[in-house]
Structures are given as C-alpha cells and as structure tokens.
From Swiss-Prot:
Family: Belongs to the universal ribosomal protein uL2 family.
Location, primary (coarse class): plastid
Pfam families referenced in this protein's UniProt entry, alphabetically: Ribosomal_L2, Ribosomal_L2_C
Signal peptide bounds: none
Self-association state and partner proteins as the record states: Part of the 50S ribosomal subunit.
Protein name: Large ribosomal subunit protein uL2c
Domain of life assignment: Eukaryota
UniProt xrefs under Gene3D superfamilies: 2.30.30.30, Nucleic acid-binding proteins (2.40.50.140), Ribosomal protein L2, domain 3 (4.10.950.10)
One annotated GO molecular function: rRNA binding
Organism the protein comes from: Ostreococcus tauri
Gene behind this protein: rpl2
HAMAP family: Ribosomal_uL2_B
UniProt key word Chloroplast: yes
Keywords: Chloroplast, Plastid, Ribonucleoprotein, Ribosomal protein
C-alpha cells in the first residue's frame, strides 16, 4: 500500500496523507459476516468513563474476522481484499471448497485468486496457517495464539511481524515486534507472513477533525486544568507541576514507573522484556 500526499491548498490539507486504496476490491462487505456494533465510547457497564478521550466517530459495521483458522485441511481461495474501518490492517474474504466464506487478516503479498490452507502439513507459503512446531526456524509469522485453540491474539496490527528464532521442548521462542523475546507453546498456531498495509504507521491525519472521525476526542494537558481536576492544575499562569515527579490524573506517579504486576505467571516465559522508550 502506498500513501497519497495532499498539497497545502488549505490548512486542513497541509501535511495530510491518505492511504491509496486503488488495490482494494470496491465491494460492499459480505453481509453474512457483518453485524452492528455497540461502541462503548470509553464507558463501563455503569456508564463511568474508564478510558478517556474516546467517543463520537463515524458509525461502523463490525466484520467478523476468523482469528482461529480452524477449518483444517481444506483449501480456500482469496476472493476480495477489503478495507476494514475497525482496524488499520486490510482484510481478505476467502471462500472454502465447501462454499463457506470467512474474513482473515490480509498478509502482505497475498493476491486475489491465491489459495491458502490451515493444516499441520501445509507448505511454507504466505497466508497458510500451521502449528508453530511445524514451522522452520527464521520464518516470519503473525496472528499468533497464546493458548492452543484460543485464536490469534498477538501480532495482528498493520505491518506487524514476529520471527521464530528457536525451538526447545514444548516451547518455541518468538521475537515480537516490541522487541520482547518470549516462549510460546509449540501447539499454538500462527499464520505465515507479515500483516499488510505496512505504511499505516506513516499516515498523517492533517487536522483535528479527522481524529474525531475515528472516535478520538481531544487530550487536554493537566497543567491547564483547575487544581480540582488534576494534580498538575491550578496556580497563577504557567506553573510547575508542583510535585517531585509528574502524576496521573488520579495522583499516581507517571512517566517511567513500572505498571506491570510484580508476580505474573508469564514472567517465566519472557526471556527479554520489550524495549521501553
């Protein structure tokens, strides 16, 4: 996927870029695989905001994605490559030999008309799904299960890719996009290849309104709030934060403080922690 850049005809088009969708199939989504979606807008079941800066945005239909790839030993043909408003990756509509249709994440290099399969004996080709124990060392994978038969949970974002670096006993070692190196059961399945739409990270929205279309509300600095609203607020004019270190809106230390649970079951599976900026 390439990007199209706008000329600065207006302040809103200055530095604005959009995805070039010329390679996508211009069709409505498969009706049997779509459903209406209630958007939580950052609220929990009591209506209390638990995630700030969310709300509004364009109305969307949810596309049901097959993260499990549990239709084994049956080939499927790629019918369309489509835009999905619910994620930055593209999705591909595949049709199996028995006529069933499913959406999958579109891997880079998979074209309309290609054949894919989920099998323990599948060849090492883009789009095929295999258990990690059956993959060769060095292969690039995405849509990785954390627990067998649960469905892919890791490496699903646009352009994301992990690498299989070692096999030992009941576990394989994966290098994840974050830089973390961890062990995963060799019975877990994954899909070969890199998630498509790799230029998504380089998109420039260009104006605030485009963030609102995506359902993102403005983020206000704590230092410009009143003291009742934020630990950094209050004072006459521009003031320091008034604490030894920055604080969250709820008074906890921020910036550089570890928030991971000290005793977590997966600590023994993580060989190298992710890169922390």
């Amino acid at each position: 996927m390439a990007l199209r850049f706008y000329k600065a005809y207006t302040p809103g088009t200055r530095n604005r870029s959009v995805a070039d969708c010329s390679g996508l199939t211009k069709t409505r989504p498969e009706k049997s695989l779509t459903r209406s979606m209630h958007r939580a807008k950052g609220r929990n079941n009591r209506g209390v905001i638990t995630c700030r800066h969310r709300g509004g945005g364009h109305k969307r239909l949810y596309r049901q994605i097959d993260f499990r790839r549990n239709k084994y030993d049956m080939a499927a043909t790629v019918k369309t490559i489509e835009y999905d408003p619910n994620r930055n990756a593209r999705i591909a509509l595949v049709e199996y030999q028995d006529g069933e249709k499913r959406y999958i994440l579109h891997p880079n290099g998979l074209e309309i008309g290609d054949s894919i399969i989920a099998s323990e004996t599948a060849v090492n080709a883009v789009g095929n799904s295999l258990p990690l124990m059956a993959m060769p060392l060095g292969v690039q994978v995405h849509n990785i299960e954390m627990h067998p038969k649960k469905g892919g949970q890791l490496v699903r974002s646009a352009g994301a890719v992990a690498q299989l670096v070692a096999k030992e006993g009941e576990y394989v070692t994966l290098r994840l996009p974050s830089g973390e190196v961890r062990l995963i059961s060799n019975k877990c399945w994954a899909t070969i290849g890199q998630v498509g739409n790799m230029e998504a990270m380089n998109l420039s929205l260009g104006k605030a309104g485009r963030s609102r279309w995506l359902g993102r509300r403005p983020t206000v600095r704590g230092s410009v709030m009143n003291a009742v609203d934020h630990p950094h607020g209050g004072g006459e004019g521009r003031c320091p934060v008034g604490h030894a270190q920055p604080r969250t809106p709820w008074g906890k230390p921020a910036l550089g403080v570890k928030t991971r649970t000290r005793k977590k079951y997966s600590d023994t599976l993580i060989l190298r922690r992710r890169k922390v900026s």
